[in-house]
Amino acid sequence: MSILFISDVHLSTKSPYITDGFLRFLSYRAMRAKALYILGDLFETWLGDDDYNLLHINIAKALKALNQRRISCYFIHGNHDFLLGQRYARACGMTLLSSNQVLKLASGKKIIILHGDILCANDNSYQLFRKYLRHIIVQRLFLSLPLSIRSRIFSAIRSCCVQHTKYKSKKKLNINLKIATDMLIQNNADIMIHGHTHQPAIHKIYRSKKNVFRIIVLGCWNKYGSMIEVNEKNNDILFTEFPLYEITKY
């Protein structure tokens, strides 16, 4: 049995082909796994657990089907869906995790998993904005507003963020490898898996010939899905990108 990791699916009513591909992924690929870890930004927008719509209902049913097959599902918040709460998590049968976790495999190997936005430490303005949005009081005030007002506020914030991002350098938008490396050292781990940047890659950092850190970055789902599979028996790690319309053949 294997453990699957995905991130940045960005489900939206505006992208039904991604939704269809994700549902096929859950039905065919995830059903054969031991566990599924969703590392944030499952949804393009999340305004609160009271925002019921057909997309949210269908995704909850599909994830609940994993739970009913005794396949564990875990979720780490992303920067698009950090308001996803316990009510929706229960409907999905998934467990909410804190912003970064250390997994210990049966072999003893440790893997750090996180969404990845906290690694973009060179972007000071984003980190300040993130800290503000994640404050419990700010979140409670926002969630107390009518859904229509929340939607307008979110649209305005997103528009500003899109414009602001256009003028940021690649250095600011990418992760800080030193911070990632320090996190691995502090947790006595040698593998990190994250998303957020939409730049799939495998970074190898050599501390010595025998001591190599691997930082694996998941891609954003669009025409292709992105997945990391960890085989607990032999510690094999497989990074895969696959056409969403061919999941049944995968």
Curated annotation (Swiss-Prot):
GO cellular component entries: cytoplasm; extrinsic component of plasma membrane
UniProt cofactor note: Binds 2 Mn(2+) ions per subunit in a binuclear metal center.
Coiled-coil region list: none
Cofactor: Mn(2+)
Enzyme Commission (EC) number: 3.6.1.54
A single GO BP: lipid A biosynthetic process
Protein name: UDP-2,3-diacylglucosamine hydrolase
